[in-house]
């Protein structure tokens, strides 16, 4: 069987993520057979949980029941987990000190983004450097630290409505933005973002949150963010904290990490 790519969060998981009555309410790693990481977790074939980086997380009874139930949409979903048995968030300084965990980790990250800090956030396939897209000082600082003063940056918006605040979007562009790969789409800018983002080209790259963690972050921040890959020039994206700290420790202020390996 072909190895599937990583898919952005599906509508059903998104509903559960925001439902206070659901046991996966605010679970930053919610997924099912229709969405979530695949390619980024596989260590070897066949594609079974034991051969993925989720193998170290033992499923709780409830997750196990879902995994074994052919009528459940989490039937044989290899990355399935919940708050009780799944990966955890940690907010760290670049010397490796853990400042906060889980809900508090996300809260501290958001507070620091509001304060103009640059945060490395571990996504499905690697770390991204993130700052508040409406804070022109933070944007300039990120470009300076990354030594890419003239390279345009993409912004992540919490939803289509927010994206429409900053770009002109037609029906086909909206469809692509909302697709299950959540690609960056180059759009005609409304020119109300800090000029350094698009380097004056008249267009802006926008994408919507691909993961539950990004949805939770943007819902609370209520501002678009810059999200650019955390990689030294002409090298692949960094995927673990130790690499990040040693290679890009001077570029970001803090890191929002998790213990699900890539």
Labelled PLM ranges:
Residues 2-262:
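Active-site-adjacent structural elements in enzyme catalytic cores
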């Amino acid at each position: 069987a072909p190895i599937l790519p990583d898919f952005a969060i599906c509508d059903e998981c998104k509903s559960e993520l925001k439902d206070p009555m659901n046991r996966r309410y605010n679970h930053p790693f919610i997924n099912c057979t229709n969405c979530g990481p695949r390619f980024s977790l596989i260590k070897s074939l066949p594609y079974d949980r034991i051969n993925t980086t989720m193998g170290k997380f033992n499923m709780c009874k409830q997750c196990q029941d879902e995994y074994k139930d052919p009528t459940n949409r989490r039937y044989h979903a290899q990355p399935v987990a919940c708050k009780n048995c799944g990966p955890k968030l940690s907010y760290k300084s670049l010397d490796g000190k853990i400042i906060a965990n889980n809900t508090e980790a996300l809260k501290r990250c958001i507070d620091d983004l509001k304060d103009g800090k640059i945060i490395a956030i571990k996504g499905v396939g690697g770390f991204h450097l993130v700052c508040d897209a409406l804070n022109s000082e933070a944007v300039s600082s990120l470009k300076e630290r990354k030594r890419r003063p003239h390279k345009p940056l993409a912004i992540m918006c919490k939803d289509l409505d927010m994206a429409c605040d900053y770009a002109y979007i037609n029906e086909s562009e909206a469809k692509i933005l909302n697709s299950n790969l959540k690609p960056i789409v180059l759009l005609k800018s409304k020119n109300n973002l800090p000029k350094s983002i698009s380097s004056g080209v008249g267009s802006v790259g926008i994408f919507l949150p691909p993961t539950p963690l990004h949805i939770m972050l943007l819902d609370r921040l209520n501002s678009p963010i810059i999200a650019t890959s955390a990689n030294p020039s002409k090298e692949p994206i960094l995927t673990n904290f130790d690499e990040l700290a040693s290679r890009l420790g001077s570029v970001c202020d803090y890191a929002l990490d998790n213990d699900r390996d890539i």
